Structures are given as structure tokens and as C-alpha cells.
């Protein structure tokens, strides 16, 4: 189902803005148990074995985890209810992006992902036009839109990623063989070596422990598997 064909909310269901405000309240209060109870009570048909299913629910739960379309990402299909807290922690910035986009929409009752998708399609079309450009005509330009400054604020830049896809990888076989040949031809003049290198003596030094700054990131367990795990680690030293 394409983005334009996806249903927005269930028939006679709450508006997008209402859902966003509901989920926003749970986030601000860190009421994860309350959110789980809310989902079980109001969407019991989506719950099975403590797993919440997002499949065929349209845009409804984009307001929960702030789905951000990209050339490579897929929509989430399910989440373990026991992992709701980790899900909300790992999508804090995405949810702030949704907040800014809702302000930009100025009361329009639709999912922010539709704005992101429309702009992504603009970038894809522009990138395709560059690949098929006619040198006899003036190249087209991608007109700057208000959404661009918001996407830039959250480090979303498809232009660079699409350009990387557009460029073909260079063969490294020749380069490696040349490097090997060069390594074989290196000559060392022992008379010019003044002293042998050595490691500094650590005696007398004080090694300070890391002041950990932990973050939570989502990692796919296996390729092609929908199940994911949430890993907590220090941004400075990598401690888990």
C-alpha cells in the first residue's frame, strides 16, 4: 500500500492531533505502564502474547513512535509491550520532529510522515533528473521549502544519501595490488634512524574514569527479521 493510499485513522476514530496529544502526555509523564494499559484497553485486537501489532493500522501509531520515512527504512510491524519504554526513549528526537511538523501543518489533520514522504519524493525525482539530465538544457533546481529547515535541524539530508547511491563504487582490486607492490619496494636506510621508538612510561600518571553519557539505540536482531533489541551504551567510551 502506498503512502497516499494508507488510511489515516480508523473509521469514526480519533483525529491525528488528538492521538498525538494522547501519546505526548504519556511521554512527558514517563507513564509507560499507563501507555501499555491504554493500548491494551483501546486496541485489544492488536495485542497478542504481549506483542502489539502495527500491521495494517495506517498512520494511527505513527503518532506513537514517530515513523520517519527514508529511502531505506521500513515501517515498524510490531513491538513487545515490555519494550515500550525503550521504544519511546529511542524515538525522542523523532517525536520532537513530529511536534515541529505539526506546528508547520497549522491544524491540518494528517500524519507528519505524509509531509516527510512528499519531500522525500521531491528529492528522489530531483536526483533522477540529475541522472538523466540533458546538457543542452538548463538543469532543474530543487526549490527550498519550509520543511527543509526542520529536516536539517534533525540531521535528515536525503540529498547526500541519494547522491551516494547514484555514484558507482570504485574497484579496489587495482589499488590494493599497487599498494602491495609499493610495500615490497620500500627501502629503509638504517643510518638515518636516530633512536628506537618506545611507549611512554605510565608511572605517575592518573587515568580518570569515563563520565558515562548513556543513550539507547534500536538494533535489528537478524537480517530480514522484524524483531529488534534495544541497546544502552555510553556515547563516550562505548560501555554497555
From Swiss-Prot:
Domain of life (superkingdom): Viruses
Alphabetical list of InterPro entries matching this protein: Baculo_LEF5_C, Baculo_LEF5_N
Record bears the keyword Glycoprotein: no
GO process terms (BP): regulation of DNA-templated transcription
Keywords: Transcription, Transcription regulation
A Pfam family assignment: Baculo_LEF5
Its job: Required for late and very late gene expression.
Family: Belongs to the baculoviridae LEF-5 family.
Full protein name: Late expression factor 5 homolog
Source species: Cryptophlebia leucotreta granulosis virus
Amino acid at each position: 500500500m502506498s503512502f497516499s493510499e494508507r488510511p489515516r485513522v480508523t473509521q469514526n476514530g480519533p483525529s491525528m492531533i488528538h492521538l498525538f496529544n494522547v501519546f505526548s502526555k504519556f511521554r512527558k509523564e514517563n507513564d509507560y505502564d499507563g501507555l501499555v494499559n491504554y493500548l491494551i484497553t483501546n486496541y485489544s485486537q492488536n495485542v497478542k502474547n504481549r506483542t502489539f501489532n502495527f500491521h495494517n493500522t495506517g498512520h494511527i501509531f505513527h503518532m506513537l513512535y514517530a515513523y520517519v520515512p527514508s529511502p531505506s527504512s521500513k515501517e515498524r510491524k510490531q513491538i513487545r509491550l515490555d519494550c515500550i519504554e525503550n521504544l519511546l526513549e529511542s524515538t525522542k528526537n523523532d517525536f520532537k520532529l513530529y511536534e515541529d511538523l505539526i506546528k508547520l501543518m497549522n491544524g491540518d489533520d494528517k500524519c507528519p510522515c505524509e509531509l516527510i514522504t512528499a519531500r522525500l519524493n521531491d528529492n528522489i525525482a530531483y536526483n533522477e533528473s540529475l541522472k538523466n539530465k540533458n546538457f543542452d538544457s538548463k538543469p532543474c533546481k530543487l526549490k527550498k521549502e519550509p520543511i527543509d529547515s526542520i529536516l536539517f535541524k534533525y540531521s535528515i539530508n536525503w540529498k547526500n544519501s541519494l547522491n551516494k547511491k547514484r555514484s558507482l563504487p570504485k574497484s579496489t582490486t587495482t589499488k590494493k595490488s599497487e599498494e602491495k607492490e609499493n610495500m615490497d619496494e620500500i627501502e629503509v636506510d638504517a643510518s638515518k634512524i636516530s633512536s628506537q621508538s618506545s611507549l611512554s612510561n605510565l608511572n605517575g600518571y592518573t587515568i580518570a574514569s569515563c563520565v558515562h553519557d548513556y543513550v539507547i539505540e534500536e538494533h535489528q536482531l537478524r537480517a530480514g527479521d522484524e524483531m529488534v533489541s534495544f541497546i544502552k551504551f555510553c556515547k563516550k567510551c562505548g560501555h554497555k
